[in-house]
């Protein structure tokens, strides 16, 4: 995926690949999580998170959500996911924020919010720092949201705190996306 000049040029291939990876995690997690290239697989999926095409982006996000949250059958291999998140979690979160803010179509926002929630649950002590770094990155297009200011700070606080419900987290992240896209209420 990284060797091609345009990774989005083969959306059907990307969709099928990440759907296969997701099914491996569901039915035979040890097959996938014990591969020596698992970190490269994680990075390839992360790179697709802020793409424009719905199907393969959704497939990559669905794979990453299960990869990070795990299954009972994958418990023996959780260190693979933890290592990948420790190594590349900030980059994954940056792609996710980029997708929420402006890069991805609106029909992917709910999927990206779920990925952001899973990242926050999987790395609760790191997510605040990752968010601050992502929002400070001048290369990150935040659309209508000022890089510094009350709205950006509120998003970092809201997304990094432990939420009692999934709905509360969804509310914080969807409001961030609406503000960035110039659709705030």
Residue ranges and their predicted role:
Residues 1-185:
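Alpha-solenoid helical-repeat scaffold
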